[in-house]
């Protein structure tokens, strides 16, 4: 079984919606890293030296490769990433190997068989 890692940078107010959508699309779990910061094309605004950045979360999804594109597109819709700038991004990268997921393999095999 081959995996992809979806890395999602999302406004903290949309974290729950993105996680729910990803699970409904086939993700079997996630890891959340809170309090992330970043910058896009425009520098962040400040008010008397204090940052006005919105809070961000990083969500990691280790997903089966056949489900990855569907999950990625579902995340984009739930997070409204393409509707307005600065709402978030999601990327996927190939995973060479993974350990600690043997308990999820049977569930993933059943999901993939239904999809194919």
Language model feature labels by segment:
Residues 1-116:
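Positively charged, small/polar-rich N-terminal and surface patches that mediate targeting and assembly
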């Amino acid at each position: 079984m081959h995996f992809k890692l979806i890395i999602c940078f999302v406004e903290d107010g949309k974290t729950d919606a993105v996680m729910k959508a990803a699970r409904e699309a086939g993700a079997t779990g996630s890891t959340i890293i809170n309090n992330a910061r970043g910058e896009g094309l425009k520098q962040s605004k400040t008010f008397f030296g204090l940052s006005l950045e919105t809070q961000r979360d990083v969500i990691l999804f280790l997903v089966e490769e056949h489900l990855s594109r569907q999950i990625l597109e579902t995340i984009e819709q739930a997070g409204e990433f393409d509707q307005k700038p600065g709402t978030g991004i999601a990327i996927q990268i190939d995973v060479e190997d993974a350990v600690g997921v043997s308990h999820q393999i049977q569930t993933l095999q059943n999901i993939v068989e239904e999809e194919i």
